[in-house]
């Protein structure tokens, strides 16, 4: 079937057949390790279209849902059957540094045909995910990601009322297939990142789910898009927020503004108690008209509970702002930005060398992972990073190994209670201060999670000793 690319965001529920979310499957080896294989697999991304060749974990994109309880040990044997070296990063987990999965900083990339064993304990309950962390712009963009759900010791919601929703956007060609030839476009690296023209949920095009009226559901939304910030409005179906980036709020809240911006790599847990006869949809709102990408049908009143269990806070150390050390981070570069004074691999970047190296962005004048750390903090020290975005583009900033609070943000309000996050969106020409206790020893990455931006220079690191 031939589809005009301009039609993708005009097509709504009528363009797809009703379906349910596919179950997740994974294989445990005899020694108790969960085996995750990076392999190519055929998968259909658009209704009635030919399959696309994706890079997957265990044959599907997203890969298997890993679901464990807080405090449990996770053991994963990663086997790389692709032609590129790879690794797995466990996004949002306050993990032992050696298990963080960052080539060049915490481990060597796993070469084709080789394997690596990850072994760690999950300290925090919540919604997390795992993904490739070598050439992420290419590997995540082709499908190397999956959900990691850490349940409370006594799960707040049973399996029927706890739904994981992995949201991705794909750039499809006119045949409805993944557009491989568009990967690595220089404009994506220097502008807003790679944006797709079709949305899937758990790898499925416009799924439809059934809920029972009057029962409480937890919807775990995970944005795995390379660069797209999803514009959502939970208030359209009376949803409340339970958690940001895996960290629960003291009580569910109603968003005081719309749209809610869910940037690349961020997660949000929604509380929904559907009403009889009131079907609703998750919609992306950035276009001229809402684009529904997941529909919920509400059936007869159920016999389950509408009671909302209280989610206990995770054991995060509170920043001591009075004793904090402040570290300025100036973000420069990108299209319509300034490039003066940027260095890459110790040499000044001119226009020609910038185009050849594809390094368009910089932190404090340095493009890409530098030899010298951004800062060193003593274990237990409170750190404030003051980020100044002197570019024309927003950025989804992610801190590895820690969660932080946004303490100050120029030009916009801070969410009530300064909720914990591991990724935040900083707007053009905006200054934002984040604070956290550097209590996890090791070398930790700080980067933009708009993956083309990270590849094009927006990566640095700090050390906790």
Language-model features and meaning:
Residues 20-21, 26-93:
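A long-range scaffold signal marking pre-active-site subdomains of enzyme folds
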Residues 63-66, 97-127, 134-137, 256-261, ...:
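Aromatic/His-enriched, Gly/Pro-containing loop or helix-boundary segments
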Residues 99-100, 108-111, 182-323, 409-415, ...:
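Histidine- and aromatic-rich segments of cupredoxin/plastocyanin-like copper-binding domains
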Residues 50-67, 197-208, 358-379:
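N-terminal edge beta-strand
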Residues 1, 7-27:
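N-terminal export signals
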Residues 11, 23-37, 140-172, 250-394, ...:
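Extended terminal and domain-junction accessory segments
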Residues 236-248, 390-419, 451-455, 463-465:
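Active/binding-pocket-proximal capping segment
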Residues 78-82, 222-224, 387-391:
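Asparagine-centered strand-capping/turn motif at beta-strand->loop junctions
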């Amino acid at each position: 079937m031939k589809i005009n690319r301009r039609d993708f965001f005009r097509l709504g529920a009528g363009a797809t057949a009703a379906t349910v979310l596919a179950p997740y499957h994974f294989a445990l080896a005899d020694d108790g390790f969960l085996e995750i294989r990076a392999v190519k697999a055929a998968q259909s991304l658009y209704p009635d279209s030919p399959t696309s060749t994706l890079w997957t974990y265990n044959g599907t994109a997203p890969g298997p849902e890993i679901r464990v309880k807080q405090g449990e040990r996770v053991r994963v044997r990663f086997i790389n059957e692709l032609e590129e070296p790879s690794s797995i990063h466990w996004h949002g987990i306050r993990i032992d540094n050696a298990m963080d999965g960052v080539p060049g900083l915490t481990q060597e990339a796993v070469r084709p045909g080789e394997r690596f064993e990850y072994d760690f304990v999950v300290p925090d309950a919540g919604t997390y995910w795992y993904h490739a962390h070598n050439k992420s712009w290419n590997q995540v963009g082709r499908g190397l990601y999956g959900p990691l759900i850490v349940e409370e010791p006594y799960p707040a919601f049973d399996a029927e009322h706890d739904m994981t929703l992995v949201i991705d956007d794909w750039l499809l060609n006119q045949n409805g297939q993944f557009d491989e030839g568009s990967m690595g476009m220089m404009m994506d690296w220097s502008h807003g990142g790679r944006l797709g023209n079709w949305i899937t949920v758990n790898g499925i095009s416009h799924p439809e789910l059934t809920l029972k009226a009057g029962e409480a559901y937890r919807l775990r939304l995970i944005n795995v898009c390379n660069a797209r910030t999803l514009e959502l409005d939970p208030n359209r179906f009376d949803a409340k927020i339970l958690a940001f980036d895996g960290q629960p709020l003291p009580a569910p809240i109603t968003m005081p503004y719309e749209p809610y911006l869910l940037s690349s790599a961020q997660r949000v847990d929604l509380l929904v108690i559907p009403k009889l006869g009131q079907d609703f949809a998750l919609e992306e709102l950035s276009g001229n008209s809402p684009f529904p990408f997941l529909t919920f049908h509400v059936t007869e009143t159920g016999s389950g509970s509408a009671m909302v269990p209280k989610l206990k806070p995770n054991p995060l150390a509170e920043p001591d702002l009075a004793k904090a050390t402040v570290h300025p981070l100036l973000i420069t570069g990108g299209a319509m930005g300034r490039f003066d004074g940027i260095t890459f691999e110790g040499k000044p970047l001119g226009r020609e060398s910038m185009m050849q190296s594809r390094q368009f962005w910089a932190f404090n004048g340095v493009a890409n992972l530098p030899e010298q750390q951004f800062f060193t903090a003593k274990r237990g020290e409170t750190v404030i990073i003051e980020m100044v975005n002197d570019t024309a583009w927003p950025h989804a900033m992610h801190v590895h190994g820690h969660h932080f609070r946004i303490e100050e943000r120029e030009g916009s309000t801070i969410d009530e209670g300064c909720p914990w996050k591991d990724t935040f969106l900083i707007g053009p020409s905006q200054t934002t201060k984040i604070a956290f206790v550097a209590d996890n020893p090791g070398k930790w990455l700080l980067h933009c999670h708009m993956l083309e931006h990270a590849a094009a220079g927006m990566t640095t690191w700090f050390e906790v000793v």
